[in-house]
Swiss-Prot record:
Organism taxonomic ancestry: Eukaryota, Viridiplantae, Streptophyta, Embryophyta, Tracheophyta
Family: Belongs to the universal ribosomal protein uL22 family.
Keyword hit for Ribosomal protein: yes
GO molecular function: rRNA binding; structural constituent of ribosome
A GO cellular-component term linked to this record: plastid
The name this protein goes by in its record: Large ribosomal subunit protein uL22c
Organism this protein belongs to: Cuscuta exaltata (Tall dodder)
Summary of the function given for this chain in its UniProt record: This protein binds specifically to 23S rRNA. The globular domain of the protein is located near the polypeptide exit tunnel on the outside of the subunit, while an extended beta-hairpin is found that lines the wall of the exit tunnel in the center of the 70S ribosome.
Major localization listed first in the record, in broad terms: plastid
Pfam families given in the database record: Ribosomal_L22 (PF00237)
CDD domains noted in UniProt: Ribosomal_L22 (cd00336)
PROSITE patterns: RIBOSOMAL_L22
PANTHER family: CHLOROPLAST 50S RIBOSOMAL PROTEIN L22-RELATED (PTHR13501), LARGE RIBOSOMAL SUBUNIT PROTEIN UL22M (PTHR13501:SF10)
Amino acid sequence: MINTKPPEIYALGQHISMSADKARRIIDRIRGRSYEETLLILELMPYRAAYPIFKLVYSAASNASYTLASNEANLVIIKAEVNEGPAIKKLKPRARGRCYPIKRPTCHITIVLKDISFYDSDSESVELNLLKKAR
């Protein structure tokens, strides 16, 4: 049997130096949106976490255009997740020969894109089914 399901294209950023909670605040706003709409949202956000996510979304779109030869207007973010990474541990020198430990949080961000042009015939049948159920 031939696998006709198109692959999902992803970009993975590991060990990004920011808190996972701060990155999740941005990711929750872009999940399920189109590629072009996501870029507009991320460009206008005043948060520091928006820039690494912007770079990952752009990288995932470049991966999709290279591997699938798909148009960027047809890309949709179907999955975006943030996981905690290992904490970077440093020592801060203090007075009288002492030191305080500093833990910098890191996170791993995954962006998964899907090309909706593969699903045009399926989406029409889904819309017809929804209209029938609404009646």
